[in-house]
Amino acid sequence: MPMLSPHSLKPDTLHLPPGTSEFLGCQRRHTLPASEFRCLTPQDAISVFEIEREAFISVSGTCPLYLDEIRHFLTLCPELSLGWFEEGRLVAFIIGSLWDKERLTQESLTLHRPGGRTAHLHVLAVHRTFRQQGKGSVLLWRYLHHLGSQPAVRRAVLMCEDALVPFYEKFGFQAVGPCAVTVGSLTFMELQCSLRCHAFLRRNSGC
């Protein structure tokens, strides 16, 4: 079998008409889906953390999940996450894990209980340039439908500050009282949502 010399592998210089390179660049960009929803992987962890850090550190001085915890959950239970990508760029995400008790505890912040029937939503965040566009609402609705398609998951639970309770109530969450979990001086309300109605809506929506 003939061998190719290094010189034969070197491409000839290609001369393109003015503007062609910009056109080809646009073509390459448009090979990516304009909008895609998918479960996250450990390879997405850095992008996730960059969005989360900007969204939470400036407001509360802390993050719901740090980078090692993000990788931990995306390794153990990627099916309980959902990311929204625009042309390959992560713009919003939710990360969850399974929990096996009636109410959240301090342990629930870092544990995944494979036998649990409750999906604990640890964090929902939107990239700063995509906020105030309704993306958080769309993503949460899709995420609850996604959970509703998993037979083992019966309900969703989260904790949030009092000001955010009305937002989550629009999606079927109900406040069950103050959360036992505290983060520094921050206190939270605990909310729960049955997934049966979301599973029914998914089956009848054709999604």
Curated annotation (Swiss-Prot):
InterPro entries given in the database record: Acyl_CoA_acyltransferase (IPR016181), GNAT_dom (IPR000182), SNAT-like (IPR051635)
GO biological process, one term: N-terminal protein amino acid acetylation
Main localisation: cytoplasm
Entry-linked SUPFAM superfamilies: Acyl-CoA N-acyltransferases (Nat)
Molecular functions (GO terms): aralkylamine N-acetyltransferase activity
Subcellular location per the Swiss-Prot or TrEMBL entry: Cytoplasm
Modified residues annotated as Phosphoserine in this record: 205
EC top class, as a word: transferase
Annotated site residue numbers, Important for the catalytic mechanism: 120, 122
EC number: 2.3.1.87
The record's account of how the chain is modified after translation: cAMP-dependent phosphorylation on both N-terminal Thr-31 and C-terminal Ser-205 regulates AANAT activity by promoting interaction with 14-3-3 proteins.
Coiled-coil parts of chain: none
Modified residues (Phosphothreonine): 31
Cellular component GO terms, alphabetical: perinuclear region of cytoplasm
Subunit structure: Monomer. Interacts with several 14-3-3 proteins, including YWHAB, YWHAE, YWHAG and YWHAZ, preferentially when phosphorylated at Thr-31. Phosphorylation on Ser-205 also allows binding to YWHAZ, but with lower affinity. The interaction with YWHAZ considerably increases affinity for arylalkylamines and acetyl-CoA and protects the enzyme from dephosphorylation and proteasomal degradation. It may also prevent thiol-dependent inactivation.
Purpose: Controls the night/day rhythm of melatonin production in the pineal gland. Catalyzes the N-acetylation of serotonin into N-acetylserotonin, the penultimate step in the synthesis of melatonin.
Record-given protein name: Serotonin N-acetyltransferase
